[in-house]
């Protein structure tokens, strides 16, 4: 007997989460206050990167806390990459911070990721031009059209179906989870059973924005254009290619 959650179960759980378990935004402010008061790094760019990674970890911990409260566990597992073909829309700021994170990695790992990205953009050039031209503002079918082309995320290692920047993967990736049978993702390009904690994104971006403003007038070149990079959103592959 398979007692996995159904779509109907998820509708009820979703309602419960929305009514009772939306986290307090103050948690995100407390995190940035702690970093600003006790920074592990000295330079402004390093503190911003430290904040970026800390806020992403906070998103993960908040999701786990909600899961505990409503007694659910994701059926996602390492090596399952169906959602890694979804359109990831993010800010230019986040794309820049992901690249800064890669730059901070050990030399061998850093070179491996950059070589992977260059190969990715070269081998998927025509498909990327096609999918990144889909208007996600105006076209209600943009997600389906994008997924139908089966262009993987720039950071997906297709040999292992794992993420090369898992620790700093964008919020659409880390907030999208399946709690029903794992087959639902295999059987549909856009399964209705999946759940997104996208409400956490606003808390995270607001807190990150607050930290940026702390360092706007520092002498150090942060490589960030404020506020443009915060508000400019586009497909992740397009932003990464422009910033490489």
Which residues make up each language-model segment?
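Short loop/turn segments that flank or connect secondary-structure elements
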Residues: 1-244
């Amino acid at each position: 007997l398979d007692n996995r959650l159904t779509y109907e179960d998820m509708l009820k759980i979703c309602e419960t989460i929305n009514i009772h378990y939306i986290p307090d935004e103050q948690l995100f402010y407390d995190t940035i206050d702690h970093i600003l008061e006790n920074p592990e790094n000295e330079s402004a760019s390093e503190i911003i990167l430290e904040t970026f990674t800390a806020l992403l970890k906070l998103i993960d911990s908040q999701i786990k806390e909600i899961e505990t409260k409503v007694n659910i566990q994701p059926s996602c597992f390492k090596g399952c990459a169906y959602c890694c073909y979804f359109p990831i829309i993010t800010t230019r700021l986040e794309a820049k911070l992901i690249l800064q994170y890669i730059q901070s990695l050990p030399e061998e790992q850093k070179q491996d990721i950059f070589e992977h990205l260059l190969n990715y953009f070269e081998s998927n050039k025509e498909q990327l031009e096609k999918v990144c031209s889909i208007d996600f503002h105006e076209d209600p079918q943009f997600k389906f059209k994008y997924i139908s082309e089966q262009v993987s995320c720039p950071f997906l290692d297709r040999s292992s179906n794992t993420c090369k920047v898992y620790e700093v993967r964008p919020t659409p990736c880390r907030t999208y989870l399946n709690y029903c049978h794992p087959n639902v993702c295999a059987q549909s390009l856009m399964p209705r059973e999946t759940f997104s904690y996208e409400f956490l994104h606003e808390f995270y971006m607001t807190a990150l924005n607050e930290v940026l403003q702390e360092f706007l007038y520092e002498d150090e070149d942060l490589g960030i254009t404020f506020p443009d990079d915060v508000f400019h959103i586009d497909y992740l592959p397009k932003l990464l290619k422009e910033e490489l």
